[in-house]
């Protein structure tokens, strides 16, 4: 029975739509899918019904199944149906109808009629409440649509749909993660499973719904992939759902199940029983073709997940039958062909094993499956083992041959291992299958006797069973008995194969071989030839071949001595190539047996052995005996090549003819193959012997099919056979029939034959004569065009060693234009004619032209690939072909572009070959205008590029040929080619330049070469912006290099600078940078002399831009200035010059990019040249000379700047305008000067330091412009910064000049300042390595400048003096009076002044004193106080710098002087400054000094330190800082004092401590009379407490000095003479710590205890609440300290009780109770005896009027007392 809660829930659900009030009814009625609530509330049922009915009729028209609801849900009576008054049965029927409708409407929610029809059910029957689950389930797959969002807004969510709660009345649709959470609930999955069952049963599933279901289940599986327990719970549910889906007839349902099963098995491997059951379910209802493929994929995936033992066992018979019925064999093959991406080896292994077990009819077909699938090794082993077992019981064992041959072909060793595991050998198994199988034998091969023995054992075991009598066997196969004296070599292959199988069967059944042979072959001839054929048959087992050899030996013994058996030798010789050593060995024995017989002219079966009445030429008995004897004596069984033995050198012609005839007439394919291989392998084989095979070659191609059939039936490798046949064509072949045979084989339709002969040609071709070579080449070309070949004709052609003469002949035979292109009288090219055009339009001629183009393409591709050694005839032929291709292009409109490009490559290769062979030559027959015209007419950039390369290559071989076409070529390149952004175009331009330009320069026809060069430069530089950025350097460097760098760099630089100027004027800054980057990289391609010379020449060109230059008359006549410069105005020329100089400056100067690219760094290039010992001195001098010229030109440009003038405006105008113009001129000239000074700096920076100094000294010493000297001096300073110490001699030179400059009174402040800074920099760098005389002189001059009253010079002088003191040390002592007082005076002068240079000045002074402290500390003591003051008050100097100086002071100055000076500085300066930074630095120095001082010195300096300490204690009374700052200062002072105290002994510290006590209590030694006693006491007690914490019990006895004063002070607190809470707290803390750290019973002294205890405990009378806890601690500590003295305990108890009486004040009692509680908690056992006196007091306090006191006693003191006594306190109260 359901619980009460369930019953109530059911009642609530039933009454969910019962509305007793109007608002509730309105709310229920307004729930709508279509309308908003306000609109819905106004609608009546009739209106809703009418709208819904119309939509319902639309649904019926779409799907007739909706018609069933016409008389129920959508009947006219439904308007009046009220669900709330229906019976249970009626409600049940209504719910069923609604559910059926929702299942049917599910795929149609996207239709408007569906919404309006369902609207009726929601409004009338409230299905969103009563059928909410079905409504949600049927629309769940629509969760991303607006419909589902509307449903969520009105539906009452069932509990299982809680994940949708956040999306109710929300603008967002549920997410994919929400669906995963929903489906991850097992209860919901069960609900959804039931829903699926219903829709499957009702057959209302549809694709989108199934797809949604599948995806959801897959997501759930993926979501729980790492949760194996959850997956195990999902397995039964998913299997159940899959089973229901598979039971459906819908292919979509089945495919959904397939997908779910595959994913589930992948995530959680299922056991085999489940997979077998799933497979059975999948196959049980498989009808549709669409589902069949998916079913097979799924089954394969399921089986692929199996692991462990038995995973590839054969299928149960029932499952196999289902698989066989569902998937026919051909279907499985097709599946494997198309679906290789699936791994399905386990399923197909099980399937194959099932075929082996149940379905033997398919055994012969399983090879097809095996060929299409890759199996694991263990799977192959299982299959092989099953097949071996099957071979024991299978009647028709021939079905197994194909499959075993396949396994042996892929892994013969594995098959043999499987046989060995079953105690079988390969030979026995071959007999069992009646065929030859194994080809690869192990080194430990069994001998013939062993094989026969094993075979006999197998026979014996077979004979033990029920064997058929031989007579019955013979009767059964009597039709195959041979009674004629015939050669069995000639019988048909079918009959022989059958006889062979009978022989194998007879042997395997245990019949004697001789019995079989004598019974089935009644004549000796047929028996011998039969065993002979078996011996050389690849299809016969090895064991059978051995038996046949044994029988042959027996048969030979039965032949009369007069019969010569040499006729059998050729076949036996081929048996010597058998893979089995045993066969070869036994064959040799048979040959030895024949050799022992007499050699007569009566040959055995001489005319019938190879054919009826076929007489084969034989050797004479003498020759045959000689041959056989020598052969056997030389033959070794292990030999693999016996060709040299077959054809001995003696009488080789006789033997060659004999063996050639034998090879020709041998009817057996295997023997013929062996024989041909032996013959064609010997060197004697030549075209004379190939004549023997003329008829064979003539008929071979027509008879090829029959030979192929023979090879297949006899298991002979047909490819080996055909290779041997193709080898008949001999090296140096002259026979035309043989060449025809070769060509026919190539052109045959048989791919194998064509490819074999194509390979054969490669070795034959070099040995043939020219006509035959030409014939073969021409036939390959013709056949490649005329028909589709079975081999790659082009590849074969390109593999042949063709010569230039072959190509010339082929090209001549395939030409179109019959005109003689080499006729020199024809100076113009042949033009396209109308006749040619009209002719080529005809179809037949057009086809011929296309074929001709194909031939030409093949020829050209071959020529391009081979790169033959060329001659002039070939070049002429190629030019003729170029004309032909133009004809085909222009007249015929054929696609000749590829052929033209290939021809261009061939022309390049040909010219290159001619050049390497003959060098320069004259080619009068070559027409360059053909090339130029082809270049112009071609529309392909690649074609144009290649033809340009041809022009260039031709120029290098025959310059005269192309010189008259130079300008058109370069014009074309500038306009088109260099704009192509590809490697090939760039290579083309570079190569063309490098070939044509030298020819141009060498030509005698060019008179004014400079004009030509400048024209070329302008042509190429104009196209600069169009050249791809990354191609520019390579292209232009090639051009300049070929034109001559020394003459061309400057004009080219001028042209580029002009474009740079244009960019600047147009504000294209980024583009202008590209020019600088380019030219830096460009210059790196040339040596340094060429670069410097180029810059110098550029200056000459820039000078031509000056209006007043003497050279400017030359400018208009130069080609270089023809591009607009001549027409420029003066102002434009000035701008151009300025920008040109700016360009030079940026090219010479270093940039960030030069750091990563050293090749473009001009400075580094110069340095490497000057410092390289391998470079000649002459070259270095040339570099220096070029640099001096560059420097002089730079300085000259600077000097000339002032004389430049120009007029930007018209001369007419007002004075104001003229003034404005002059102002602009000044600005421009200033800009030009700045550029030149920057250029000068960069130029000077190029040289090494020695050369640099030599260059600038004359400038610094002379009457050079001040700004020039200023820049030079700055550059000098920077130059020396990174120079090595070895450059000090050079530094002396420059220093001498700089010192002289500082002595000149006429020098400006700017020059003096930069000079002093440079001196400082040089001295810092080289120090004492410099000349001491110069250093002293520098010091004198700096001291003079120190008094100049100019702050700039004072700073620079101080800097120089600092570096000099650092360098010279004590040697500077004589200048002390001139430095220190002056520096102090300067500091004081500017201390309170406002100046921008104040920071630098203070820093310079601080650093000056720092250097003195470091180098001459003892001499600075007289001014140490001033140094400290300056240090503390240099506010503009960084604190880190001043702290570093403090460290130097402590390190170098004697500490006694430091302490004394600190005491003075504090008293006289710092204490009165109110400078917090100064105080902080003072304390830092004091702390550093205290930490650094040793104990001995500390003892000596202790009076000084403690005087300073007392001064620091007094600081709080005079400073203006806030309380927190004062406390931090005092904390630092206490910490420093404690560190100092730790370095003193007791003897020293006691009097000092007494001194401090007297200072605090008596005011002795107080320097500040304004400081009150309370302030002193607070400072003292803080110090004492800090010291007590550090020294603990060591200074407990020191309390004697302050015992009485402290007692008095406590009494003053009681009497309120002194009221200071902070002081009282400090006193209590000091007492507490003293009691706490007492280890010497100091406070157990009665006198001290009595003195202090009363005063301390009496503090309870008026202690402030904020410090009450400190008093409690002090009393508790005193009690703890005296706990062992009963008398003292009694005294304390009495004193405490006196403050706990009822008459006492409330707070007094409260703190007394607290104190007593602490005492008992710490020393309760010692005070138990005193408890009786306390009990009445406690009893009174428990009834105290003050609740806080009463509560403290009850909850505090009583509890503590009880814990001490161990019993309740109530007993004492009663």
UniProtKB/Swiss-Prot annotation:
The record lists the lineage as:
Eukaryota, Fungi, Dikarya, Ascomycota, Saccharomycotina
Read off the Pfam families from this record.
Answer: BP28CT (PF08146), HEAT_HEATR1 (PF23243), U3snoRNP10 (PF12397)
Q: Which gene encodes it?
A: UTP10
Native species of this protein? Kluyveromyces lactis (strain ATCC 8585 / CBS 2359 / DSM 70799 / NBRC 1267 / NRRL Y-1140 / WM37) (Yeast)
Location of region: Disordered: 1206-1226
Q: Where in the cell is it found?
A: Nucleus, Nucleolus
First-listed, main subcellular location of the protein, grouped into a coarse class: nucleus
The record's section on InterPro entries has: ARM-type_fold, BP28_C_dom, HEAT_type_2, HEAT_Utp10/HEAT1, U3snoRNP10_N, UTP10
Cellular component per GO? 90S preribosome; small-subunit processome; t-UTP complex
Q: How does this polypeptide assemble, per the annotation?
A: Component of the ribosomal small subunit (SSU) processome.
One GO MF term on file is: snoRNA binding
This chain belongs to which protein, by name?
U3 small nucleolar RNA-associated protein 10
Q: State the superkingdom.
A: Eukaryota
Q: Which PANTHER family match?
A: BAP28 (PTHR13457), HEAT REPEAT-CONTAINING PROTEIN 1 (PTHR13457:SF1)
Tell me the Gene Ontology biological-process terms attached to this UniProt entry.
maturation of SSU-rRNA from tricistronic rRNA transcript (SSU-rRNA, 5.8S rRNA, LSU-rRNA); positive regulation of transcription by RNA polymerase I
Quick one: signal sequence residues? none
């Amino acid at each position: 029975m359901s619980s009460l809660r369930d019953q109530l829930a059911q009642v609530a659900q039933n009454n969910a739509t019962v509305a007793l009030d109007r608002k509730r009814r309105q709310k229920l009625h307004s729930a709508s899918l279509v309308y908003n609530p306000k609109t819905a509330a106004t609608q009546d049922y009739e209106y809703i019904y009418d709208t819904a009915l119309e939509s319902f009729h639309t649904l019926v028209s779409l799907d007739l199944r909706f018609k069933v609801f016409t008389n129920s849900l959508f009947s006219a009576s439904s308007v009046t149906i009220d669900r709330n008054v229906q019976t249970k049965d009626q409600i049940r029927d209504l719910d069923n109808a609604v559910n059926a409708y929702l299942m049917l409407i599910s795929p149609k929610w996207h239709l408007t009629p569906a919404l309006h029809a369902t609207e009726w059910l929601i409004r009338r029957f409230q299905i969103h409440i009563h059928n909410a689950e079905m409504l949600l389930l049927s629309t769940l797959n629509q969760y991303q649509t607006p419909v589902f969002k509307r449903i969520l807004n009105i539906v009452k969510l069932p509990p299982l749909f809680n994940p949708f709660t956040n999306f109710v009345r929300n603008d967002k649709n549920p997410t994919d993660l929400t669906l995963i959470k929903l489906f991850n609930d097992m209860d919901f999955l069960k609900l959804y499973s039931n829903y699926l069952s219903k829709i499957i049963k009702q057959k209302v599933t549809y694709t989108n719904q199934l797809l949604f279901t599948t995806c959801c289940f897959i997501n759930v599986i993926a979501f729980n992939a790492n949760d194996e327990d959850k997956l195990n719970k999902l397995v039964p549910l998913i299997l159940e759902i899959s089973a229901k889906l598979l039971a459906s007839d819908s292919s979509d349902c089945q495919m959904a199940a397939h997908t779910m099963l595959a994913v589930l098995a992948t995530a959680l491997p299922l056991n085999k029983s489940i997979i077998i059951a799933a497979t059975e379910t999948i196959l049980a209802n498989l009808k549709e073709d669409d589902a069949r493929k998916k079913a097979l994929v799924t089954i394969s995936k399921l089986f692929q997940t199996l692991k462990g033992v038995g995973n590839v066992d054969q299928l149960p018979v029932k499952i196999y039958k289902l698989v066989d019925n569902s998937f026919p064999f051909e279907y499985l093959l097709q599946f494997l062909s198309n679906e290789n991406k699936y791994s399905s080896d386990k399923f197909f292994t099980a399937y194959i094993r099932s075929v082996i077990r149940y379905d033997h009819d398919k055994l012969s077909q399983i090879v097809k499956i095996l060929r299409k699938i890759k199996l694991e090794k263990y799977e192959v082993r299982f299959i092989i083992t099953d097949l071996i077992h099957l071979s024991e019981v299978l009647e028709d064992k021939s079905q197994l041959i194909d499959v075993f041959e396949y396994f042996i072909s892929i892994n013969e060793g594995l098959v043999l291992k499987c046989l060995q595991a079953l105690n079988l050998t390969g030979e026995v198994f071959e007999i069992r299958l009646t065929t030859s199988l194994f080809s690869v034998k192990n080194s430990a091969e069994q001998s013939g006797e062993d094989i026969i023995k094993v075979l006999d054992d197998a026979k014996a075991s077979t004979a033990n069973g029920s064997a058929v009598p031989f007579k019955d066997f013979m009767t059964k196969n009597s039709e195959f008995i041979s009674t004629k004296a015939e050669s069995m070599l000639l019988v048909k292959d079918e009959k022989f194969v059958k006889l062979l199988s009978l022989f194998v069967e007879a042997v395997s059944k245990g019949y004697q071989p001789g019995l079989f042979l004598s019974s089935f072959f009644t004549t000796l001839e047929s028996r011998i030839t039969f065993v002979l054929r078996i011996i050389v048959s690849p299809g016969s087992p090895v064991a059978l071949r051995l038996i046949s050899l044994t029988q042959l030996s027996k048969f030979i013994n039965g032949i009369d001595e007069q019969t010569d058996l040499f006729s059998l030798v050729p076949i036996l010789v081929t048996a010597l190539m058998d893979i089995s050593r045993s066969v070869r060995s036994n064959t040799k024995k048979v040959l030895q047996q024949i050799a022992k017989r007499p050699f007569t002219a009566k040959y055995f079966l001489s005319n019938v052995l190879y054919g009826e009445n076929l007489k084969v030429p034989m050797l004479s008995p003498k020759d045959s005996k000689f041959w056989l004897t020598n052969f056997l004596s030389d033959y070794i069984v292990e030999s693999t090549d016996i060709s040299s033995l077959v054809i001995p050198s003696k009488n080789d012609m006789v033997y060659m003819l004999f063996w050639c005839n034998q090879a020709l007439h041998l009817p057996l394919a295997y023997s013929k193959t062996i024989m041909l291989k032996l013959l064609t392998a010997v060197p004697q084989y030549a075209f004379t012997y190939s004549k023997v095979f003329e008829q064979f070659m003539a008929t071979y191609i027509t008879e090829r099919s029959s030979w192929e059939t023979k090879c297949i039936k006899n298991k002979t490798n047909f490819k080996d056979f055909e290779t041997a046949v193709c080898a008949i064509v001999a090296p140096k072949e002259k026979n035309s029939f043989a060449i025809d045979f070769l060509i026919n084989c190539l052109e045959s339709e048989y791919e194998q034959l064509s490819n074999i002969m194509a390979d054969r040609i490669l070795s034959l071709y070099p040995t043939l004569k020219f006509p035959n070579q030409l014939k073969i080449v021409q036939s390959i070309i013709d056949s490649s065009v005329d028909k589709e070949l079975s081999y790659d004709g082009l590849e074969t052609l390109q593999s042949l060693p063709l010569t230039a003469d072959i190509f010339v002949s082929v090209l001549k035979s395939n030409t179109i234009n019959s005109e003689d292109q080499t006729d020199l009288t024809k100076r113009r090219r042949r033009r396209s004619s109308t006749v040619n055009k009209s002719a080529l339009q005809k179809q037949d001629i057009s086809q011929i032209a296309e074929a001709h183009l194909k031939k030409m393409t093949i020829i050209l591709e071959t020529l391009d690939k081979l790169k033959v050694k060329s001659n002039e005839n070939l070049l002429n032929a190629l030019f003729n072909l170029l004309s032909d291709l133009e004809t085909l292009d222009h007249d015929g409109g054929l696609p000749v572009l590829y052929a033209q490009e290939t021809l261009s490559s061939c022309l390049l290769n040909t010219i290159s070959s001619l050049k390497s062979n003959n060098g320069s030559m004259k080619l009068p027959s070559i027409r360059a205008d053909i090339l130029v015209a082809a270049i112009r007419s071609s529309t392909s950039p690649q074609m144009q590029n290649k033809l340009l390369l041809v022009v260039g290559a031709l120029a290098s071989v025959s310059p005269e040929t192309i010189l008259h076409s130079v300008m058109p070529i370069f014009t074309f390149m500038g306009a088109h080619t260099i704009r192509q952004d590809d490697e090939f175009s760039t290579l083309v331009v570079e190569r063309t330049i490098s070939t044509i330009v030298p020819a141009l320069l060498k030509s005698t026809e060019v008179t004014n070469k400079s004009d030509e060069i400048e024209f070329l430069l302008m042509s190429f530089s104009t196209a600069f912006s169009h050249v791809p950025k990354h191609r520019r350097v390579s292209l232009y460097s090639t051009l300049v290099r070929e034109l001559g760098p020394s003459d061309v760099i400057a004009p080219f630089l001028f042209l580029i600078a002009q474009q740079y100027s244009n960019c600047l004027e147009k504000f294209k800054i980024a583009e202008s940078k590209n020019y600088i980057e380019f030219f830096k990289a460009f210059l790196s391609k040339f040596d340094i002399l060429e670069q410097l010379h180029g810059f110098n020449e550029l200056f000459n060109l820039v000078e031509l831009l000056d209006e007043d230059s003497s050279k400017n008359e030359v400018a208009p006549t130069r080609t270089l200035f023809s591009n607009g410069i001549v027409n420029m105005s003066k102002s434009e020329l000035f701008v151009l010059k300025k920008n040109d100089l700016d360009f030079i400056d940026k090219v010479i100067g270093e940039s960030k990019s030069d750091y990563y690219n050293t090749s473009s760094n001009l400075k580094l290039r110069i340095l490497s040249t000057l410092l390289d010992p391998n470079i000649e001195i002459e070259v270095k001098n040339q570099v220096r000379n070029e640099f001096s010229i560059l420097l002089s030109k730079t300085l000259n440009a600077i000097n000339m700047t002032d004389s430049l003038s120009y007029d930007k405006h018209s001369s007419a105008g007002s004075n104001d305008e003229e003034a404005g113009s002059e102002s602009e001129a000044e600005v421009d000239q200033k800009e030009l000067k700045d550029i030149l000074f920057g250029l000068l700096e960069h130029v000077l920076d190029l040289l090494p330091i020695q050369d640099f100094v030599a260059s600038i000294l004359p400038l610094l010493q002379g009457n050079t412009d001040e700004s020039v000297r200023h820049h030079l001096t700055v550059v000098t300073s920077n130059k020396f910064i990174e120079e090595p110490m070895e450059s000090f001699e050079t530094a002396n030179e420059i220093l001498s000049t700089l010192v002289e400059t500082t002595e000149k009174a006429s020098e400006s402040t700017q020059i003096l300042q930069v000079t002093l800074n440079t001196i400082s920099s040089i001295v810092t760098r080289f120090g004492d390595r410099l000349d001491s005389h110069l250093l002293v002189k520098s010091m004198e001059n700096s001291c003079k400048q120190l008094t100049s009253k100019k702050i700039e010079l004072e700073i620079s002088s101080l800097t120089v003096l600092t570096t000099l003191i650092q360098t010279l040390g004590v040697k500077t002592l004589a200048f002390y009076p001139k430095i220190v007082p002056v520096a102090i005076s300067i500091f004081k002068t500017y201390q309170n002044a406002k100046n921008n240079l104040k920071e630098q000045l203070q820093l310079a002074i601080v650093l000056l004193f720092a250097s003195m402290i470091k180098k001459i500390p003892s001499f600075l003591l007289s001014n140490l106080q001033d140094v400290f003051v300056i240090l503390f008050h240099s506010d503009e100097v960084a604190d880190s710098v001043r702290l570093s100086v403090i460290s130097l002071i402590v390190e170098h100055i004697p500490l006694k002087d430091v302490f004394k000076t600190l005491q003075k500085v504090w008293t006289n300066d710092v204490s009165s400054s109110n400078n917090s930074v100064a105080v902080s630095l003072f304390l830092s120095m004091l702390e550093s000094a205290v930490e650094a001082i040793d104990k001995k010195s500390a003892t000596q300096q202790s009076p000084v330190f403690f005087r300073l300490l007392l001064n620091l204690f007094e600081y709080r009374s005079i400073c203006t800082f806030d309380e927190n700052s004062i406390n931090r200062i005092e904390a630092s002072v206490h910490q420093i004092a404690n560190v100092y105290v730790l370095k003193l002994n007791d003897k020293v510290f006691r009097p000092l401590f007494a001194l401090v006590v007297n200072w605090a209590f008596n005011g002795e030694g107080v320097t500040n009379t304004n400081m009150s006693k309370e302030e002193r006491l607070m400072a003292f007690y803080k110090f004492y407490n800090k010291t007590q914490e550090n020294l603990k019990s060591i200074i407990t006895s020191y309390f004697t000095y302050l015992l009485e004063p402290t007692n008095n002070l406590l009494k003053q607190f009681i009497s309120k003479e002194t009221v200071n809470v902070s002081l009282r707290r400090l006193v209590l803390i000091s007492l507490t710590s003293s009691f706490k750290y007492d280890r010497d019973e100091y406070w157990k002294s009665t006198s001290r205890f009595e003195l202090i205890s009363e005063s301390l405990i009496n503090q309870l009378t008026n202690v402030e609440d904020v410090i009450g806890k400190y008093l409690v601690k002090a009393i508790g500590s005193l009690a703890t300290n005296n706990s062992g003295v009963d008398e003292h305990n009694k005294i304390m108890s009495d004193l405490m009780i006196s403050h706990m009486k009822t008459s006492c004040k409330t707070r007094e009692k409260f703190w007394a109770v607290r104190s007593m509680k602490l005492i008992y908690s710490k020393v309760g056992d010692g005070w138990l005896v005193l408890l009786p006196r306390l009990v009445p007091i406690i009893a009174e306090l428990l009834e105290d009027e003050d609740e806080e006191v009463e509560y403290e006693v009850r909850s505090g003191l009583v509890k503590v007392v009880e814990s001490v006594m161990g019993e309740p306190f109530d007993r004492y109260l009663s």
